[in-house]
């Protein structure tokens, strides 16, 4: 078969490890008890109570008014200037993939270590990508990517630092991409109210609302950039059920405030449990905690043998990331291994 029309190479793409891969763990630890307790992601274990969805949402194409309602709800929840600044998408990951393809090839600095899909997406789109350890190391990059709060260590930058960086990049025709996937429940100041030609913000829905399978995420950008991104995604990018559920959830500020309080208490409880096990918490958010252990690989295997999945890091074998258990049974299972 002649593959000359294809732009991709024949080599297999390199796989990026993610949390939530229970299939691989079941194969590696076939004697582990079921059901597995999945603490390998940073997804809220107590999901938003899904409201009833009209049957027609499953059977007809989404309407423009429904998309606009979601945009307005998202703008209010995130503090964006208007619904015209909001780009709904079937998950933030597709936005991470789409944005690099809209820009001419340039130098990209990714503040790392962080979520690996950012560097991978910019590289696939033909940009020259470097992972840098600090804002001082970005040099003359045309695009800078920061995850704030960062995954996996929870690192944050002040709003002044982030706004200053966006302004600097804008003056030279560049762009700051601020991934605020874990910002909803944290006491951080979002950049969403300040988007302009040099700033695009990404927001995740599934992590905060515990509905990752719904596939919903947002870009917040000035209206011209937002329109280009929406055009790149194509029509009906978000399903009817996701539009309905997302609009209801984003409009529920009381649930969001109570969830922030409850998950912060859970994170503090997890920190105490990790400390009793000899771990040193190095950071995180209220949806996950990252810690170093004297024998990280050994603890990882011990947890897996007990049917508990946590996130490990090839480059830092002493480091593990823990999500939050969903209920009393989950907390007890984790406690038995860590004590």
Q: Whereabouts are the PLM-identified features?
A:
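Conserved beta-loop-alpha segment that forms the PLP phosphate-binding cup at the N-terminus of a helix
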Residues: 68, 83-108, 217
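Conserved PLP-anchoring active-site segment centered on the Schiff-base-forming lysine
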Residues: 100-123, 128-130, 134-135
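Conserved PLP-binding catalytic core of the aspartate aminotransferase-like
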Residues: 264, 274-306, 324
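PLP-dependent enzyme catalytic core of the Aspartate aminotransferase-like
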Residues: 158-160, 305, 315-339
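Active-site phosphate-binding strand-loop segment of PLP-dependent enzymes
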Residues: 123, 130-185
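Short, conserved charged micro-motifs
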Residues: 50, 137, 295-302, 328-333
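PLP-dependent aminotransferase class I/II
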Residues: 198-281
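N-terminal "arm"/small-domain region of PLP-dependent enzymes with the aminotransferase-like
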Residues: 2-66, 73
């Amino acid at each position: 078969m002649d593959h000359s029309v294809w732009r991709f190479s024949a080599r297999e793409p390199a796989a990026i490890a993610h949390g939530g891969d229970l299939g691989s763990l079941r194969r590696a630890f076939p004697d582990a008890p079921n059901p597995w307790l999945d603490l390998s992601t940073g997804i809220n274990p107590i999901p938003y109570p899904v409201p009833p969805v009209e049957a027609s949402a499953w059977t007809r194409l989404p309407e423009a008014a429904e998309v606009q309602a979601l945009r307005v709800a998202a703008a209010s929840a995130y503090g964006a200037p208007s619904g015209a600044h909001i780009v709904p998408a079937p998950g933030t990951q597709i936005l991470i993939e789409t944005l690099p393809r809209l820009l001419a090839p340039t130098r990209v600095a990714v503040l790392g270590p962080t979520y690996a899909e950012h560097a991978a997406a910019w590289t696939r789109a033909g940009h020259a990508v470097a992972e840098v350890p600090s804002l001082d190391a970005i040099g003359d990059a045309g695009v800078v990517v920061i995850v704030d709060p960062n995954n996996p260590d929870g690192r944050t930058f002040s709003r002044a630092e982030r706004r200053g960086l966006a302004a600097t990049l804008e003056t030279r025709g560049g762009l700051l991409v601020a991934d605020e996937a874990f910002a909803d429940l944290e006491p951080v100041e979002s950049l969403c109210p300040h988007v302009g030609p040099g700033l695009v913000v990404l927001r995740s829905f599934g992590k905060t609302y515990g509905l990752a399978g719904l596939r919903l995420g947002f870009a917040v950008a000035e209206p011209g950039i937002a329109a280009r991104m929406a055009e790149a995604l194509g029509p009906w990018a978000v399903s009817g059920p996701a539009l309905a559920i997302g609009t209801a959830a984003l409009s529920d500020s009381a649930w969001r405030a109570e969830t922030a309080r409850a998950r912060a208490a859970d994170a503090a409880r997890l920190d105490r449990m990790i400390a009793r096990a000899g771990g040193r918490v190095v950071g995180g958010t209220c949806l996950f905690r990252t810690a170093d252990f004297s024998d990280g690989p050994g603890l990882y295997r011990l947890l897996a043998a007990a049917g508990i999945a946590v996130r490990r890091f090839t480059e830092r074998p002493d480091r593990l990331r823990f999500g939050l258990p969903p209920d009393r049974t989950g907390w007890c299972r984790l406690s038995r291994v860590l004590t």
